[in-house]
Amino acid sequence: MAAWLVASGSAMAHHSLAGTYDIKSEGKVTGTLVKVAFTNPHGAMTIKVHNADGTDTDWVMTTGSANTLQNLGFGKDGPNTVKAGDTVTITYYAARNGKPLGFIRTITLPDKREITLSNGNSNE
């Protein structure tokens, strides 16, 4: 029983947004998708953002599971497809450690449609 409690606590900590991301701190970036991975338990996108000082920063943006994204029509195929080379705008929950990491809240596709991927649920 004790092992189950420890394991379930670890699983909840792993899947909790609040541990890694500040869901009260939203940011927004526009850039070019470099890499897209639709995987479980969480997908990820790397986006190259051109900074005002002329440098580029690669941001790693986490998403929900491939299954959740597929239910939204978002993925490798479907009505909301994205691929490397696409220019997108992402609103995200910022990483608590200040690094260029985030959990995607919305993504604006090249055709200007905005898709909500997260509502800030602490167990997404």
Predicted regions and their residues:
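Short aromatic-glycine-enriched beta-strand elements
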Residues: 39-50, 105
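A short macromolecule-binding patch
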Residues: 52-65
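Short nucleic-acid-contacting surface segments enriched for D/E, G, S/T with interspersed K/R
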Residues: 71-89
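Short boundary/loop segments of OB/S1/cold-shock single-stranded nucleic-acid-binding domains
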Residues: 12-27
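OB-fold/S1-family single-stranded nucleic acid-binding modules
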Residues: 93-120
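A beta-strand/beta-hairpin structural motif
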Residues: 62-74
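Conserved hydrophobic positions within beta-strands
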Residues: 29-33
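Bacterial N-terminal signal peptides
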Residues: 1-10
